[in-house]
């Protein structure tokens, strides 16, 4: 109910550098703008992970991973993204992020960065 008919939603549990590269390679094959929603664990290589998507996302929205004490704080993740030349913002949660970027325009929205985040998305939506 938060997406328009011209929008595609992709969810990917990628959380390692190798899986981020694979996701990024796939995203490069898509047409149209791509928006990301990302939450990641503190123990990951945040800078390298985000840098992989540097030229892929039109905008990146960062979120905390719900009920996960090891979640990297969303504002810290947004700062890392901005340092890597991404237009980035933080959102309260997945729903807030979807509301922020959803519109009538054709686009792909990708939720990624943690299996815990994806599990929460699937459980609640």
Model regions: which residues?
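Active-site-proximal loop/hinge segments that shape catalytic or ion-binding/gating pockets
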Residues: 114
């Amino acid at each position: 109910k938060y997406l328009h008919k011209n929008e595609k939603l992709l969810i990917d549990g990628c959380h390692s550098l190798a899986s981020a590269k694979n996701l990024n390679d796939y995203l490069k094959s898509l047409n149209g703008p791509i928006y990301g929603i990302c939450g990641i664990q503190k123990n990951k290589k945040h800078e390298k992970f985000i840098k992989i998507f540097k030229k892929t996302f039109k905008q990146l929205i960062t979120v905390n991973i719900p009920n996960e004490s090891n979640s990297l704080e969303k504002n810290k993740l947004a700062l890392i993204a901005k340092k890597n030349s991404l237009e980035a913002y933080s959102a309260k949660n997945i729903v807030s992020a979807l509301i922020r970027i959803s519109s009538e325009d054709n686009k792909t929205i990708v939720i990624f960065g943690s299996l815990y985040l994806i599990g929460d998305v699937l459980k609640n939506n």
